[in-house]
Amino acid sequence: MESFPIINLEKLNGEERAITMEKIKDACENWGFFECVNHGISLELLDKVEKMTKEHYKKCMEERFKESIKNRGLDSLRSEVNDVDWESTFYLKHLPVSNISDVPDLDDDYRTLMKDFAGKIEKLSEELLDLLCENLGLEKGYLKKVFYGSKRPTFGTKVSNYPPCPNPDLVKGLRAHTDAGGIILLFQDDKVSGLQLLKDGEWVDVPPVKHSIVVNLGDQLEVITNGKYKSVEHRVLSQTDGEGRMSIASFYNPGSDSVIFPAPELIGKEAEKEKKENYPRFVFEDYMKLYSAVKFQAKEPRFEAMKAMETTVANNVGPLATA
């Protein structure tokens, strides 16, 4: 099998720009995932985020997780469970309104650090969306405009730790799923593996590369590209050894009232395929309500369910201007 795509974004600024853009295009079309190096985010900042995130888990969350596992009987499993994940998490909201000042137990220095980190990830997310636009033949800013709706995109971070698990064959760190939203940027542990994606019917490891940012595409980009790019099923395996695995996933998603539909330009480019929309038109908030109930099920029935709701969305709605 071909190797997992690792993209050196620094090469976009030189003679290898065309080759690098082609690598991004291939990764989006054939993997739904790629890994970025030389992405412009300070390595010192990433080291500090990793250090303080692991310290926060040890200080504030480790004992709670152990108690929760014990209370649910997950420390003495005898058979496989498919309705729970072996992970400890908390969430930070950045857009349209930040909650980072309200999340309990965070040291002030950690709050400040994560605000800085979120700003850098937001900027990189928008830069990557424009690279996708370029490869798709869409005007610069098209995806960002679609994501804005009447307000701003929904942007937040899930901070996860996957502690050592005594029965990794019986419980996943995170069950297989596709991501509901737009573009997801992941800063993951470079010492402990575990993230896998499904490609051609086989589970493939996403290699932990120091200081890299893993990018994956969500369901909304599959719809907007009319299936040219696909969201891909992925999971996290539980581990028995070490200190556990850190994962910081930031989700740059459409605003709640954003109307999502295949880009007309991409339908036109599919002339040989009868110029038809293969995907529904819907309000992102409606999709999320459905997704929250069936996250760990196949995405195709979600798309079919949204098709049944299409009549509630005006047929002539286009991308709304940014604020």
UniProtKB/Swiss-Prot annotation:
* Residues involved in 2-oxoglutarate binding: 245
GO MF: 1-aminocyclopropane-1-carboxylate oxidase activity; L-ascorbic acid binding; metal ion binding
UniProt cofactor(s):
Fe cation
Q: Report the sequence similarity comment from the record.
A: Belongs to the iron/ascorbate-dependent oxidoreductase family.
* Alphabetical UniProt keywords: Acetylation, Ethylene biosynthesis, Fruit ripening, Iron, Metal-binding, Oxidoreductase, Plant defense, Vitamin C
What is the name listed in the Swiss-Prot or TrEMBL entry for this protein?
1-aminocyclopropane-1-carboxylate oxidase 4
What induces its synthesis?
Strongly induced by wounding, ethrel, iron, ethylene and 1-amino-cyclopropane-carboxylic acid (ACC). Accumulates in response to very-long-chain fatty acids (VLCFAs C20:0 to C30:0).
- Domain of life, per the record? Eukaryota
Catalysed reaction per UniProt? 1-aminocyclopropane-1-carboxylate + L-ascorbate + O2 = ethene + L-dehydroascorbate + hydrogen cyanide + CO2 + 2 H2O
Which Gene3D superfamilies does the record cross-reference, listed alphabetically? B-lactam Antibiotic, Isopenicillin N Synthase, Chain (2.60.120.330)
Q: Which pathway does the UniProt entry assign to this protein?
A: Alkene biosynthesis; ethylene biosynthesis via S-adenosyl-L-methionine; ethylene from S-adenosyl-L-methionine: step 2/2
Q: What is its EC number?
A: 1.14.17.4
Report the residues modified as N-acetylmethionine. Answer: 1
Q: Tell me where in this chain the Fe2OG dioxygenase domain is found.
A: 153-254
